[in-house]
């Protein structure tokens, strides 16, 4: 229904009225990944939009807001100057390579400033962020292939994400207990053989 309202509003020109009537002040927009979410083996929900959509968004923002840097915002805050227009800060989180390869060229071509928050702990190593690890496991692992030793006639169905995650967490706890038991056995063996 909201899609129909939006199209109807666009036909009547209400979208232009809506944005031109927004109050003065600071607006902030945050993006994560830019590209085609269908092409990733990791978390598709981290994608904010495609490159085409980013270009459309930025063009729209330029039309309705004065886009400022975080440094300019800092100056507003330092001087306690009142914001008498619609200003916007644009940020990108986590520092995925597509921010550089996809977003930056569009930002440059439209002469739009933005700030990038880089997850510095991921630079120079092959660490995959936890949310991408979880998404990768969920996309590539067959729930029916989980071996549940000691459980008879148990079937895992992907009724909803919560049930599957609880089953995985239970499996992790079981593995932890098993590892702790094996470490105790190894310690006992080493103490008796030494």
Report the location of each language-model feature.
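Membrane-embedded segments
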Residues: 87, 91-106, 110
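Extended, charge-rich helix/loop segments that form flexible
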Residues: 21, 127-194
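Conserved, mostly hydrophobic/aromatic
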Residues: 29, 61, 93, 107, ...
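C-terminal domain-boundary segment and adjacent tail
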Residues: 46-82
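Membrane-proximal basic amphipathic "stem/tether" segments
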Residues: 1-30, 38
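Short beta-strand segments
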Residues: 28-31, 118, 190
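Short, solvent-exposed loop/turn segments at secondary-structure junctions
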Residues: 32-36, 73-75, 95-97, 121-124
């Amino acid at each position: 229904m909201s899609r129909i309202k939006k199209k109807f509003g666009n036909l009547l020109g209400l979208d232009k009225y809506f944005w031109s009537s927004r109050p003065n002040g600071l607006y902030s927009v945050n993006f994560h990944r830019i590209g085609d979410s269908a092409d990733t083996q990791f978390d598709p929900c981290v994608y904010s939009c495609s490159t085409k959509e980013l270009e459309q968004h930025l063009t729209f923002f330029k039309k309705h807001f004065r886009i400022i840097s975080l440094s300019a915002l800092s100056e507003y805050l330092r001087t306690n100057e009142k914001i008498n227009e619609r200003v916007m800060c644009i940020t990108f989180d986590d520092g995925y390579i597509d921010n550089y390869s996809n977003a930056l060229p569009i930002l440059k071509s439209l002469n739009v400033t933005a700030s990038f928050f880089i997850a510095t702990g991921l630079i120079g190593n092959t660490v995959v962020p936890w949310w991408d690890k979880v998404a990768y496991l969920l996309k590539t692992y067959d729930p029916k292939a989980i071996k549940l030793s000691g459980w008879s006639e148990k079937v895992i169905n992907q009724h909803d994400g919560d049930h599957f995650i609880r089953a995985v967490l239970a499996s992790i706890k079981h593995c932890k207990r098993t590892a702790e038991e094996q470490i105790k056995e190894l310690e006992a063996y080493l103490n008796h053989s030494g």
